[in-house]
Amino acid sequence: MKLDNMFKKTRIVSRIQSHSAVRASRPEVPEGLLRKCNKCGAAIIAEDVKQGYYICPKCGGYFRVHAYRRIQMVIDEGTFEEWNQDLIGGNPVNYKGYPEKVQALQEKTGLKEAVVTGKGKINGRDTVIAVCDGRFLMASMGWAVGEKITRAVERATEEKLPVIIFACSGGARMQEEMCIRDRPDA
């Protein structure tokens, strides 16, 4: 046996131990405590982001705001009534894997579709609101998204109420595009 081989195992063990020591010396940060700004990369306390209306205090960059959080920020507390909750799109052109993808997003986001519509009060005044949520297929517009927004605007018109739409979208859903284009009223 060579003298080199005699100490090989010791070198490997010492490398593993030194790597573990470096990991152990890093401070543990509880999950969800910090948010990273996508614009400047700064780590900001999550509560500060929320209190600052989702604007980075370092660079002024914007954080994404989920639909129900946006409604909570705008509508008077306890006054929001959601409309058409059960209106969801389908898979009219039998796009492979689309139903599974939608179901996974529904479970992950707690949303049934990419837009939340309803009525609430802003400073005591009734208002109709539609809020898109980019977490759900980039808030792309499928049949149900268009229908929910249309119904909200029509109802607001009937009730003579103002409408606020927070729109953000990745475009039209290719999985439903043929169906939308072939609709008789399109």
Regions found by a protein language model. Give the residues of each.
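Intrinsically disordered, low-complexity segments enriched in small/flexible residues
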Residues: M1-L111, I122
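Short acidic, glycine/serine/threonine-rich loops at helix termini
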Residues: M141, Q175-E177
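A structural preference for short, pocket-lining loop segments at secondary-structure junctions
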Residues: G120-C132, K148-R173
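Conserved small/polar residues in nucleotide/adenosyl-binding loops
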Residues: M178-D182
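Glycine-rich anion/phosphate-binding loops
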Residues: K108-A114, A139-E154
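Conserved P-loop NTPase/AAA+ ATPase motor core
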Residues: Y98-T117, F136-M138, K160-L161
